[in-house]
């Protein structure tokens, strides 16, 4: 049961990590875009 629980945690963390990276890259892109203006 512990292995299934850990597997569920990993499956839950992967999308959150990808979303965090995407948001960070998007904010940096907008920040650079504002600096161009």
UniProtKB/Swiss-Prot annotation:
Membrane protein topology class: Single-pass membrane protein
Residues crossing the lipid bilayer are 5-25
Give the chief site where it resides.
plastid
Q: Which UniProt keywords apply?
A: Chloroplast, Electron transport, Membrane, Photosynthesis, Plastid, Thylakoid, Transmembrane, Transmembrane helix, Transport
A GO MF term: electron transporter, transferring electrons within cytochrome b6/f complex of photosystem II activity
Localization, UniProt: Plastid, Chloroplast thylakoid membrane
What are the recorded Gene Ontology BP terms? cytochrome complex assembly; photosynthesis
Q: Name one GO cellular component term.
A: cytochrome b6f complex
Task: Determine the domain of life of the protein's source.
Answer: Eukaryota
> What Pfam families does the annotation carry?
PetG
HAMAP family, per the entry: Cytb6_f_PetG (MF_00432)
Q: Give the record's subunit note.
A: The 4 large subunits of the cytochrome b6-f complex are cytochrome b6, subunit IV (17 kDa polypeptide, PetD), cytochrome f and the Rieske protein, while the 4 small subunits are PetG, PetL, PetM and PetN. The complex functions as a dimer.
The record's family statement is: Belongs to the PetG family.
Physiological role: Component of the cytochrome b6-f complex, which mediates electron transfer between photosystem II (PSII) and photosystem I (PSI), cyclic electron flow around PSI, and state transitions. PetG is required for either the stability or assembly of the cytochrome b6-f complex.
Q: What is this protein called?
A: Cytochrome b6-f complex subunit 5
């Amino acid at each position: 049961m512990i292995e299934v629980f850990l597997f569920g945690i990993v499956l839950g963390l992967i999308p959150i990590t990808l979303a965090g990276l995407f948001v960070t890259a998007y904010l940096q892109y907008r920040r650079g875009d504002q600096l161009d203006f």
